Amino acid sequence: MLRSAAITKGTQRSPNRAMLRAVGFGDEDFNKPIIGIANGYSTITPCNIGLNDLARRSEEAARQAGAMPQMFGTITVSDGISMGTEGMKYSLVSREVIADSIETACNAQSMDGVLAIGGCDKNMPGAMIALARMNIPGVFVYGGTIKPGKLADRDLTVVSAFEAVGQHASGKINEEQLTAIEKNACPGAGSCGGMFTANTMSAAIETLGLSLPYSSTMAAEDEEKANSAARSAEVLVDAIKANICPLDLLTKNAFENAISVVMAVGGSTNAVLHLLAIARSAGVDLCIDDFERIRQRVPVICDLKPSGRYVTVDLHKAGGIPQVMKQLLDAGLLHGDCCNVEGKTLRELLKDVPSEPSAEQDVIHPLSKPVYAKGHLAILKGNLASEGCVAKISGIKTPVLTGPARVFESEEACLAAILNNKVKAGDVVVIRNEGPVGGPGMREMLAPTSAIVGADLGDKVALITDGRFSGGTYGLVVGHVAPEAAVGGMIGLVHEGDSITIDADQLLIQLNIENDELERRSSAWKKPQPRYQTGVLGKYARMVSSSSKGAVTDQP
């Protein structure tokens, strides 16, 4: 029996049916599955501006496949627009709001399945958390990647604009050049074009089996993206008939596959946070140490921005995520018996994919010639991060740095110092009280890291924070430091000028002071007053878990 029978069957449900008749149901439609289409459409960001077209195509295809689609809206936050402002504190919060809203709408109306459509970064994990919580048949449709901007012979992304700010501040480009980059960085619809957070998470979801093969790297404006959205609706109707549910797919092995692909494509640090959160909702025992274990055996084989040369549309032309997965599968680095929403195993899905990438491209490298021999997201531990932290070590020349701490209590204070040339080579920049509780909301530090790169300090300065980093960040950056400063973590005890060691080779992050002094500082520490007492940020700060556990808000 369909779950929607709770609102469509029996004489007692006559009032319920009366409401449904008003939105287009006829007598015969009450026997059809009701599919929710969770539409993240918004004109605030290029990431989501094209979603309405995909939603309409999905709606039409679901109806033709014998279902009754019911569309409802969910929110988005544009990280690119809110970046570097107080508004960025709402970004990670929006992941929870999206998950809560999809769960609420689907469960309140007893929907039989859900097709979630999203574009910007938090849309993907928000939808996946909801699918895992509800465990009703579901499919995710990614809005698609933006095409690269062009300026002379350069491919641009939005990160080019952030880095240009630092270049302008250090006198490397003039205002006219800055404006030219600004005007050409984002040429149309789609999510930020490198292997940043949105494209990383879409690749992870394709690997997990809850979106269709090849769909995670398609360009937003190409016809194949709309066709894939329609096909996704058809697959969802079949999944309802076959009772294929998210928890059938979201196994520990599936998460290990997703981590392997994130490493192989050089994906965002945010994947650690989001995969931990999705796994928690799915009841899967995934921990931060699993990322380090997998990193040690999976190389980076894709040469993608932010630290590489190519953008996601180039990856798609080179064979997309299936080509990446085929190499990993053949090398024994993926679990081939994991299934996708079509009911096919990974091994079945990849059987016709070439074992080696085409020699006519160099976006995807063969495993024998990786971009980096090991994964790029290292989990460091030490007295500064007893629960762990995430270091992105792709594109760095110096994996070990010991230097004096430059301590900032906010992103804004740090950015001002960088733009005023007060951060020097050899410094270890510390931005604290930006964690899940302390921020609250764990802002991304793209503005400071881009300014550092723009000032030609990317391989000379380290930056550590209890906040996050954008998927567009590269250099020696360490985020998600846990415990965070606001709950008494050691990062809150660092003084200006203290010696700090970051050793990505030894997986160490260390405050180099005597234990007696550490204990003295710890005893003197007082919990700071919350920055927000009310509203969504106040509520979030009271509920959110440590970043080492995914920064979730529905922990028991």
UniProtKB/Swiss-Prot annotation:
Sites where the protein binds [2Fe-2S] cluster: 47, 120, 192
Active site: 470 (proton acceptor)
The protein's required cofactors: [2Fe-2S] cluster; Mg(2+)
Gene Ontology MF annotations: 2 iron, 2 sulfur cluster binding; dihydroxy-acid dehydratase activity; magnesium ion binding
Pfam family, any one: ILVD_EDD_N
Cofactor note: Binds 1 [2Fe-2S] cluster per subunit. This cluster acts as a Lewis acid cofactor.
PROSITE patterns: ILVD_EDD_1, ILVD_EDD_2
Catalytic class of the enzyme: lyase
Metabolic or biological pathway: Amino-acid biosynthesis; L-isoleucine biosynthesis; L-isoleucine from 2-oxobutanoate: step 3/4; Amino-acid biosynthesis; L-valine biosynthesis; L-valine from pyruvate: step 3/4
Keywords: 2Fe-2S, Amino-acid biosynthesis, Branched-chain amino acid biosynthesis, Iron, Iron-sulfur, Lyase, Magnesium, Metal-binding
Residues recorded with modification N6-carboxylysine: 122
GO biological process: isoleucine biosynthetic process; L-valine biosynthetic process
UniProt EC number: 4.2.1.9
Membrane spanning residue stretches: none
Subunit composition and interactions: Homodimer.
NCBIfam families (UniProt xref): ilvD (TIGR00110), PRK00911.1 (NF002068)
Protein family according to the UniProt entry: Belongs to the IlvD/Edd family.
Protein task: Functions in the biosynthesis of branched-chain amino acids. Catalyzes the dehydration of (2R,3R)-2,3-dihydroxy-3-methylpentanoate (2,3-dihydroxy-3-methylvalerate) into 2-oxo-3-methylpentanoate (2-oxo-3-methylvalerate) and of (2R)-2,3-dihydroxy-3-methylbutanoate (2,3-dihydroxyisovalerate) into 2-oxo-3-methylbutanoate (2-oxoisovalerate), the penultimate precursor to L-isoleucine and L-valine, respectively.
Identification of the protein by name: Dihydroxy-acid dehydratase
Organism: Prochlorococcus marinus (strain MIT 9303)
